[in-house]
């Protein structure tokens, strides 16, 4: 086996990616740790892997997510340190998830910076993820009281590239209206390249109450917006409710807290696809849109990179107005055909980039 794949947090999108790579790429072997207690995975997984990965003269490439402290592993296992080392960022600890510096554990972000210095190639799942990480390095290192290292961004940036998270879209046409199923086939067969991006958190705590009250009033009385119309509010209102729950949760898994089930599988089972969408991982939104959801996203973070302008809002007031309009006019979302692109995010479009990435250059010292 020439490709060594390591995943220190084997769950959610981390699991989804490495399972796909191992299935599609011959000559690979996968070592993992369960997706729990991520803090401890980030701190100690390198030592565990160093003791449990057998030595092999056939390894040529090491692929790992940024949960792993690649620096420690390379030091503990010099044989692995000689491989072509690829580090994949699902999220970065310089901007996600904690916003306040005093609440952030310096070590996690510092370890990711060190891992980038050791890696041969650093891959991010979006331009936003890459730029937010690279441009935060300087400010982050100023937290060191004195004798600060310099020029880290300029050292790391040349190694960096963006390869979007690859989605293997299943056939969900039997769950969808015919006009949407036909449109789905059309947009998936279009050109297969990807897109560009910006930063901050979602603001809609206040407007959330108004949206929930709106739904309650529709429950309590009949009128121009009946139960069927409530359905078309679907993802957006429930997304807001989910975010409130997500933001208040203190479960230790929230750093990597995606639903473990593939969003396509979940939504395919749901009538009108009324499921909460995740705030951080853009591929979860794309999976939902693929299943017929109307995306309504903040004009911030990674979303402008993925979705056309008509699906973005800038203020809580705009969000509230859009939701109320959807409630009064449910046909807008029912009949809507997504105007963005899906093909650039499919495995069919991205497999060539991953195959090229996971091709070893000859190394004399192996």
Curated annotation (Swiss-Prot):
Pfam families per the UniProt record, alphabetical: QTMAN_N
GO process annotations (BP): regulation of translation; tRNA modification
Compartments, record wording:
Cytoplasm; Nucleus
Name the Enzyme Commission number(s) assigned to this protein.
Answer: 2.4.1.110
- Indicate whether Glycosyltransferase appears among the record's keywords: yes
Q: Give UniProt keywords alphabetically.
A: Cytoplasm, Glycosyltransferase, Nucleus, Transferase
Q: What is the lineage of its organism?
A: Eukaryota, Metazoa, Chordata, Craniata, Vertebrata
Q: Which reaction does it catalyse?
A: queuosine(34) in tRNA(Asp) + GDP-alpha-D-mannose = O-4''-alpha-D-mannosylqueuosine(34) in tRNA(Asp) + GDP + H(+)
What is this protein's name? tRNA-queuosine alpha-mannosyltransferase
**Superkingdom to which the source organism belongs:** Eukaryota
């Amino acid at each position: 086996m020439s490709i060594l794949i390591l995943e220190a947090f084997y769950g959610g999108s981390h699991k989804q990616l490495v399972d796909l790579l191992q299935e599609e790429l011959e000559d690979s072997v996968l070592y993992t740790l369960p997706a729990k207690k991520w803090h401890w995975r980030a701190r100690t997984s390198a030592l565990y892997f160093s003791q449990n990965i057998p030595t092999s003269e056939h390894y040529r490439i090491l692929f790992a997510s940024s949960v792993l402290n690649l620096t420690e592993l390379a030091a503990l296992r010099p044989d692995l340190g000689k491989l072509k080392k690829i580090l994949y960022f699902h999220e970065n600890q310089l901007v996600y998830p904690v916003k306040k510096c005093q609440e952030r554990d310096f070590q996690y972000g510092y370890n990711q910076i060190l891992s980038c210095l050791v890696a041969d190639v650093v891959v991010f799942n979006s331009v936003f993820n890459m730029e937010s990480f690279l441009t935060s390095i300087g400010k982050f290192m100023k937290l060191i009281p004195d004798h600060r290292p310099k020029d880290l961004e300029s050292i790391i940036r040349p190694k960096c590239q963006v390869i979007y998270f690859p989605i293997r879209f299943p056939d969900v046409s039997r769950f969808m209206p015919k006009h949407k199923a036909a449109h789905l086939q059309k947009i998936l067969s279009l050109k297969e390249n990807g897109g560009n991006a910006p930063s901050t958190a979602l603001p809609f705590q206040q407007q959330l109450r108004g949206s929930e009250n709106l739904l309650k009033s529709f429950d309590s009385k009949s009128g121009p917006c009946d139960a069927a119309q409530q359905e078309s509010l679907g993802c957006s209102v429930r997304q807001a409710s989910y975010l409130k729950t997500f933001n208040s949760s203190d479960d230790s898994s929230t750093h990597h807290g995606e639903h473990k089930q593939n969003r396509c599988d979940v939504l395919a089972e749901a009538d009108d696809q009324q499921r909460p969408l995740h705030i951080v991982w853009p591929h979860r939104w794309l999976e939902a849109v693929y299943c017929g959801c109307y995306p309504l996203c903040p004009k911030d973070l990674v979303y402008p990179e993925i979705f056309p302008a008509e699906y973005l809002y800038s203020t809580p007031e705009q969000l509230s107005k859009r939701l109320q309009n959807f409630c009064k006019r449910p046909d807008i979302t029912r009949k809507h055909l997504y105007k963005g692109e899906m093909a650039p995010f499919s495995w069919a479009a991205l497999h060539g980039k991953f195959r090229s990435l996971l091709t070893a250059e000859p190394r004399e010292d192996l």
